Each structure stands twice: as structure tokens, then as C-alpha cells.
Regions:
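Conserved SAM-binding motif I beta-strand of class I
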Residues: 45-50
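Helix-to-beta-strand junctions that scaffold the AdoMet/dcAdoMet cofactor pocket
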Residues: 17, 40-41, 126-128
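A short acidic, Gly/Pro-enriched loop at the edge of an enzyme's catalytic core
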Residues: 17-20, 84-94
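Class I S-adenosyl-L-methionine
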Residues: 140-184
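S-adenosyl-L-methionine
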Residues: 1-20, 34, 38, 56-89
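Conserved beta-strand signature within the Rossmann-like core of class I S-adenosyl-L-methionine
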Residues: 26, 118, 125-136
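Mobile active-site "lid"/loop adjacent to the S-adenosyl-L-methionine
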Residues: 95-118
């Protein structure tokens, strides 16, 4: 069976540029933050966002334990406020929507309203040949609603400026899926 996490990184890898700027808009336990930190290298910059202190602490501990390059800024704030922190064009941006894995609190999730703002702003900030990956988890109510909202929103972007793709296991409607947005 296809591993969606591996597939996501296969799409992102050709867009990575040493010394560029990347963002993990939903830091969670720091998996993507760590991967981006290593990929961007010592001269790159990685911004990571989460609204939960637990996510920030877990990510910081992981980055330190894994001896990640000191190229990251961990931000305890909503990804919808990304423009307050990121001033440079983005090479790569990653969203893993939903709730904090392992927290046991499935009631605290990303929300359509803030996700819409964050995704719109992140797309606007993409550098030429930049890429944005958005993983959606429709197995819970808000995740399904976020997926519908993103389908509608992303389908309206000009094909002359962006390539927007969706990857989904079509015979498993509650399985995670993801969008890839590439700026031309």
C-alpha cells in the first residue's frame, strides 16, 4: 500500500533549497519541523507554529535530542498569524491538519476559519517554484469540513500561476489525503 507520508516528501524534496526558508504550520510533535530543519541546513530557516505549549515543548526536546541544526524558530501562536513572523518568501510549507497526535485531546483541532487564512497567506508567500503540502484527516468532523473547504478554495487558483493537486485513496473516504500546491 502507498505510504502517504513518504509520497508527500517525494513531492517536496525536489523543491528544497539549502539556505532557503520553510515553515511547519502545525508543528505537533516536531516530525516535519525536524525534517525541514535538516533539509534547509545551517544557512536555512524554519518557522514552526502551534497553539499548544505541549507541542512546542515536545518539538523543542525532539530537535535538541536529534541535534537538529539551530535554524528554527518555534512559535506559540496560530498559523493564521504567520505573516506576523515570516517576512521572507517560502520555499516549502507543510500543514498536517487535525489534532495533536498522542495528546488524547481530539476536541482541540485545527479549524476551517484559521486554516483558510493560513493557507491563503502561505500560498501568497510561496517563492517561485515553492511548494505547499496540506495533509487532511477527514476521519473526524472538523477534518472532513476542512477538506471540503480546501477543495472548494484551492480549485479557484489560476492554473497559470499554480499547480494544485490532490492525492487520496478513493475507496477509503475517511483515510487521510493531501493537497500539493506548487507555484510556477
Amino acid at each position: 500500500m502507498i505510504d502517504l507520508l513518504t509520497l508527500q516528501k517525494d513531492f517536496i524534496t525536489p523543491h528544497l533549497k539549502e539556505g532557503a526558508v520553510a515553515a511547519d504550520f502545525t508543528m505537533g510533535n516536531g516530525n516535519d519541523t525536524l525534517w525541514l530543519s535538516r533539509a534547509m541546513g545551517e544557512n536555512g530557516k524554519v518557522y514552526a507554529f502551534d497553539i499548544q505549549e505541549k507541542a512546542l515543548e515536545s518539538t523543542r526536546a525532539r530537535l535538541e535530542a536529534e541535534s537538529a541544526p539551530q535554524n528554527y524558530t518555534l512559535i506559540l501562536d496560530s498559523h493564521s498569524n504567520l505573516k506576523q513572523y515570516i517576512k521572507e518568501p517560502l520555499c516549502v510549507g507543510m500543514f498536517n491538519l487535525g489534532y495533536l497526535p498522542g495528546s488524547g485531546n481530539k476536541a482541540l483541532t485545527t479549524l476551517r476559519e484559521t486554516t483558510r487564512v493560513a493557507v491563503t497567506d502561505a500560498i501568497e508567500m510561496l517563492d517561485h517554484d515553492g511548494i505547499l503540502m496540506i495533509a487532511v484527516y477527514p476521519g473526524h468532523e472538523e477534518g472532513a469540513l476542512e477538506g471540503e473547504m480546501l477543495d472548494e478554495m484551492l480549485s479557484k487558483y489560476s492554473r497559470f500561476q499554480y499547480c494544485v493537486s490532490k492525492f487520496r485513496i478513493i475507496n477509503s473516504p475517511t483515510s487521510p489525503f493531501f493537497f500539493i500546491i506548487e507555484r510556477k
